[in-house]
Amino acid sequence: MKSITVTQSAVQKCAQLLERANSVGVLTGAGISTSAGIPDFRGPQGLYVTRRYDPDTIFDINYFYANPAPFYEFAHDFIGLEATIEPTFAHRFLAHLEMIGKIKGIVTQNIDSLHQMAGSQNVLEMHGSFWRSFCLVCAQEYSFEIMKHKLAQENVVHCPCGGVIKPDIVFFGENVKFMDEAIHLAEKTDLFLVIGTSCVVYPAALVPTYASGDIVIINKSLVDLPRGNVVLQAQEDIDEFFKNIAALLQVKISDN
């Protein structure tokens, strides 16, 4: 395996900021989950490209109401992936920071629930997740495990009442979840981490602009945020970056 190096000055600065901070908020995007085996949806190896999904079709709520089959083709692939993946080092490190009282909440654009699987408790899933689903007719709730079972038997999953079941994810045409709570988290914390997101999907991209404290960005590509209180932008491999921080802070994170 090719070794990955990270910029030690960036590691040291981020570690110092984490040590000094009394309260930390976090925004995460697809980049934190790619090493778990979930492709970035829009990247060169993303699900939209490799399976030729049209996001304007499969995630449009009105199209889903009219014809849920294209979405469920995607759902078969995604839930198949989700059943086999585990949280990354970065997910587990963030869960540790919450456990010791540093992190007050995580806002995520991801629908994979890996933060919860890693042990994080206060997670705001702005785009929802597959963790639960609802019948569009009778509102009966279904767990992830039941949905997996149903997907193995049906191309488009239905409730016994005959209604189509929709995972609790946000489609185009629906409002994002927890926007007010995400803004409040950014406003009340004295350090805000932006991890694995290019901040191009709105309104989630607006959340860091409400940060009252220092902002640290960790992402493989450059993120264009108003400079304001951005004190560090590290274009790094996310897991390796946090492994170096954990080593510097003498934090032991158990393996998966």
Specify the residue positions occupied by each region the protein language model found.
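Conserved catalytic core of sirtuin-type NAD+-dependent deacylases
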Residues: 1-256
